[in-house]
Amino acid sequence: MIKPTVIKIGGATLGSHDTALADIVEIQKRGIPLVVVHGGAKVVTRWLERQSISTRFIDGERVTDESALEMVAAVLGGLVNKEIVAAINDLGGEAVGISGIDGALIQSRIRNRKMGYTGNVVRVNTGILDTLLSSGYLPVISPISSHTLDRPEDTPPMLNINGDTVAGEIA
């Protein structure tokens, strides 16, 4: 199998005049294997504000406390991921939305305590990607990971990961 091209898109791609999704569909139709990793920081921030959950950033990355982590997982793993998958499928592509948790795709550990539940990628298990790609599907990945390595019992089973980092690690 040919190594897939990994494309990182922002959540802002939806509803804009950006042609990225149409371009992705065109590439998939040519038989070139692709993996899409998406972000969605602005959408997450909007939802956090709606829930009156304060958010702060250090060096451009979200500090993720437990309340924010729940919202990040819901918004990125649910809303943003499914909107991107629906848009790609509406354009004639064949996309499947997953998160880094699914199939133990991304395993990580907490980067440092000041960032809260934000992690560093430790391992990428591409088995689920290989399965989807060999069946002709375009995996669309939200940057949430399994927090399985060195996880203290009192911490959540998932972590927020920067989408650019996830894309780089998968590539």
What do these predicted regions represent?
Residues M1-I170:
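Nucleotide/pyrophosphate-binding catalytic subdomain
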